A protein has these predicted regions:
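Bacterial Sec-dependent N-terminal signal peptides
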Residues: 1-24
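Short secondary-structure boundary motifs at beta->alpha junctions and helix caps
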Residues: 69-81, 151-197
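Outer-envelope beta-barrel architecture signal
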Residues: 4, 33-37, 114-116, 153-155
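A structural "domain/chain start" motif
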Residues: 18-86, 90, 193-200
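Surface-exposed short loop/turn segments
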Residues: 21-22, 103-154, 166-174
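Surface-exposed helix-capping loop/turn segments at secondary-structure junctions
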Residues: 98-108, 195-200
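Generic short beta-strand segments
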Residues: 41-46, 121-127, 161-162
Length: 200
């Protein structure tokens, strides 16, 4: 048990260190005083390793599954898109919000009370894999941009995160949605920490 715990800690430490951020526009200080954000997620022109497009990725994965079991390909496609609302997006919001003990800053979908929007544009996604004896973390790159709802063309702040890696504790992430969801959680954690320190 101690060895498993040590491995889990090392995996988390490596994941946090591997993640990088680069400010693309504006300054962290532009976000000072903002207490609520409406979340918006975008997955257009998503890059997936070894494929020209997300469409090519889906065609390949669906065909391979369909050969083994009729109907499995369509189920894979349905799950692939469903994972966004079931895993990626709620994990991002949950991870971000729990970094603020007094709820000084909150994010969420369809927050009518929020005057600002936080847009998470995913640019790269590697789902990773877990086949028991072998596994690889998921990896996500995304651009987080903030703008006022009544001025969406005026970006107050934009930052790009690369190499946000996802894995569940003790390797319990055989489902790709769980692995990728953890990458979004780690990205949100890093963003919240930077926001807390730099938006002053």
């Amino acid at each position: 048990m101690k060895k498993l715990l040590l491995i889990a800690i090392l995996l988390v430490s490596t994941t946090i260190q591997a993640q990088k951020s680069k400010v693309l526009e504006g300054d962290w200080k532009n976000l000072k005083g903002i207490s609520a954000y409406n979340l918006e997620f975008e997955y257009e022109n998503l890059e997936i390793p070894k494929y020209d497009s997300e469409e090519d990725f889906l065609k390949d994965k669906m065909a391979k599954r369909e050969e083994k079991e009729p109907g499995a390909g369509e189920r894979f496609k349905k799950a692939w898109f469903a994972d966004r609302e079931e895993h990626y997006e709620p994990k991002f919001a949950e991870s971000f919000n729990k970094r603020w003990d007094d709820k000084e800053v909150v994010v969420g979908r369809d927050m009518a009370s929020a005057d600002y929007t936080m847009k998470i544009q995913t640019t790269f996604l590697y789902p990773g894999y877990n086949v028991g004896v072998m596994r690889q973390n998921s990896k996500v790159d995304a651009i987080i941009s903030v703008y006022k709802n009544d001025a969406p063309d005026t970006i107050l702040f934009s930052v790009k995160y690369t190499k946000a890696e996802g894995n569940a504790a003790f390797g319990n992430d055989y489902d790709s949605g769980v692995r990728v969801g953890e990458a979004y959680a780690k990205m949100a954690k890093t963003f919240a920490k930077e926001l807390s320190k730099k938006a002053k």
